[in-house]
Amino acid sequence: MNIHEYQAKEILRKYGVPTSTGLVVTKTEKINETIDKLNTEVYVVKAQIHAGGRGKAGGVKVVKSKEEAKKVAHDMFGINLVTHQTGPQGQKVNRLYIESGCDILKEYYFSIVFDRSASCITFIASTEGGIDIEAVAEKTPDKIIKFSVDPATGLQDFHMRGIAYELGFKDNQAKQMKEIVKSVYNAFIETDATQIEINPLIVNSDGNLLALDAKITFDDNGLFRHPNITAMRDHDEEDPLETRAANAGLSYVKMDGNIGCMVNGAGLAMATMDIIKLYGASPANFLDVGGGADRERVKEALKIILSDKEVQGILVNIFGGIMRCDIIAEGIIAAAKDIGIKVPLVVRLAGTNVEKGEEILSNSGLAIIPAHDLADAANKIVEAIR
């Protein structure tokens, strides 16, 4: 789960991370009133969307008067902001965060993430923070600093000293950086986050370190332990089909292809998407119905897939372990009769009650294309949509 910048800063401040402060606006009619509450020489108007690249896309504006701030805010509120992370459709700006500006002497990059390949927590930092951090990582990777933390031992003093040293901080600034490292680590662990990113982390004119922007991503599996964080969820920022799927107990991620996939198990789903690509097409989604799906969940899964107007065909690939193939077959037939599946449908079943499932499908009278293995299934669905 992602949250907005202003929410991320609120959490970080609770853990002792110094951040820039401001006021959030969620209604157009509140813009002028909110800006009037700020007494500053420089105003920073920031679009609040769950995507990076706002600065380059015009979603962050710095102005020097209340009148300018009000005009910029009114112009920005409600627009579709297109960044390199939103895709061409953009993301509607339903919230603004208006801050007091500050002098910036130097920008840094600082984050903490799960390094799945190394099975540890990793700090990533750079002396080259700001809007071009992606270019820095690509063109000058030597400027990216990494420190790994063993989960068994946790954060140690040498991690904090090392990060401060590598970033070039000395004396009081080194002390501040060590405290920020510790605070961010504690926030990461205690909130079940998967990423906390501060970009930029700045040194202001007073020589103090300040988080000027912040992003936090949480592990969905840990949200039940954090109702206060769950309450921060902004459904307007999420794909409506993904939200609908989550409410039905399905793992769904929309993609850019034209072949809908319904699979049980994340690994099998990934393999299914890979083989679709191998045969010359592209998957329209990742959809894992899980090991304990019933007839209604299968039916809802197919409805969600067909809600995507880009879908030209569907591949169902089920390995029946806990899941029974006859249940899948009944769900497919129920969905087909309820909503009408007008695109080619290829079904590959294997495992528990596979013979019964195949019999149910063959006797249904529906135009379902059976497949004997994964390669056969991929070949048939790709050929069917051509």
From Swiss-Prot:
Cofactor: Mg(2+)
Entry-linked InterPro entries: ATP-grasp, ATP-grasp_succ-CoA_synth-type, ATP_grasp_subdomain_1, Succ-CoA_synthase_bsu_CS, SUCC_ACL_C, Succ_CoA_ligase-like_bsu, Succinyl-CoA_synth-like
Cited function: Succinyl-CoA synthetase functions in the citric acid cycle (TCA), coupling the hydrolysis of succinyl-CoA to the synthesis of either ATP or GTP and thus represents the only step of substrate-level phosphorylation in the TCA. The beta subunit provides nucleotide specificity of the enzyme and binds the substrate succinate, while the binding sites for coenzyme A and phosphate are found in the alpha subunit.
Catalytic reaction annotation: succinate + ATP + CoA = succinyl-CoA + ADP + phosphate; GTP + succinate + CoA = succinyl-CoA + GDP + phosphate
Residues noted as binding substrate in the record, renumbered to the chain: N264, G321, I322, M323
One GO molecular-function entry: magnesium ion binding
Keyword list, A-Z: ATP-binding, Ligase, Magnesium, Metal-binding, Nucleotide-binding, Tricarboxylic acid cycle
Domain ATP-grasp residues, every copy: 9-244
Subunit composition and interactions: Heterotetramer of two alpha and two beta subunits.
HAMAP family xrefs: Succ_CoA_beta (MF_00558)
Family per record: Belongs to the succinate/malate CoA ligase beta subunit family.
GO BP: succinyl-CoA metabolic process; tricarboxylic acid cycle
Taxonomic path: Bacteria, Pseudomonadati, Pseudomonadota, Alphaproteobacteria, Rickettsiales
Protein name in UniProt: Succinate--CoA ligase [ADP-forming] subunit beta
Annotated positions binding ATP: K46, G53, R54, G55, E99, C102, E107
